[in-house]
């Protein structure tokens, strides 16, 4: 894949091919790490059911904490990539923006991971600790040939707008500078400003799905706009696993991301 030409580590390249479509060179990731931060939300109470639905819908990978492997591994159905999330923090913590590392790259390898991810809140009072974690873990990932996804979110006392193009661009560039292979960050809400974010980041960017949207059309249009602006995929949780038709919405996303389908065409994948 051309966008990974700068990566010379063969192990990383092999694993990246498991979570990116070789033809479109893009990815659809379904994060299911919300149980740690927010508790047993609807849609991920039974992770096997959700994993099966998104796999059947064509998703390239699921993302979650190491418990996802134990409680979400199916042993049947369509294969799907596995990304182990290394960061944790809760909504009921005194500092919800603080994320700590709760597992290792070596543990992720033992669990069969195709990539690892960690979360950095850029602008949080504890952000310097998360920067240190990202920089050090990127070195370990390089040693083991493990792709690293950095979730770079502008959040903190000085952040007035988490979709501000300047702060999103800064967050994305920061993640790439500290060694991430893939950046997950907010879509700015506008294709023109997001193009500038992409231009300023040497690593491919996957957009976050964001809060649950009012309509499927609104959500899919965001995905469409982001892909045309240079995004290399989408990582969406609640807009997928809390949908009435999990398989259908996953398939609709895949139609747009991998086939450049129009929103109206993609909506036909949703049956409920």
From Swiss-Prot:
The keyword Amino-acid biosynthesis applies. NCBIfam families: ADH_synth (TIGR01949), PRK07226.1 (NF005556). Its EC number is 2.2.1.10. Catalyzes a transaldol reaction between 6-deoxy-5-ketofructose 1-phosphate (DKFP) and L-aspartate semialdehyde (ASA) with an elimination of hydroxypyruvaldehyde phosphate to yield 2-amino-3,7-dideoxy-D-threo-hept-6-ulosonate (ADH). Plays a key role in an alternative pathway of the biosynthesis of 3-dehydroquinate (DHQ), which is involved in the canonical pathway for the biosynthesis of aromatic amino acids. The keyword Amino-acid biosynthesis applies. PANTHER family: 3-HYDROXY-5-PHOSPHONOOXYPENTANE-2,4-DIONE THIOLASE, FRUCTOSE-BISPHOSPHATE ALDOLASE CLASS 1. Belongs to the DeoC/FbaB aldolase family. ADHS subfamily. Homodecamer. It comes from the Archaea. Coiled coil: none annotated. GO terms for biological process: amino acid biosynthetic process; aromatic amino acid family biosynthetic process. Transmembrane segments: none annotated. InterPro entries: ADH_synthase, Aldolase_TIM, DeoC/FbaB/LacD_aldolase, DeoC/FbaB_aldolase, FbaB-like. It catalyses: 1-deoxy-D-threo-hexo-2,5-diulose 6-phosphate + L-aspartate 4-semialdehyde = 2,3-dioxopropyl phosphate + 2-amino-2,3,7-trideoxy-D-lyxo-hept-6-ulosonate. This is 2-amino-3,7-dideoxy-D-threo-hept-6-ulosonate synthase. The active site is at 33 (proton acceptor), 153 (proton donor), 184 (schiff-base intermediate with substrate). 1-deoxy-D-threo-hexo-2,5-diulose 6-phosphate binds at residues 33-37, 153-155, 209-210, 237-238. GO terms for molecular function: fructose-bisphosphate aldolase activity; hydro-lyase activity; transketolase or transaldolase activity. It comes from Methanococcus maripaludis (strain C5 / ATCC BAA-1333). Disulfide bonds: none annotated. Keywords: Amino-acid biosynthesis, Aromatic amino acid biosynthesis, Schiff base, Transferase. Pfam families: DeoC (PF01791).
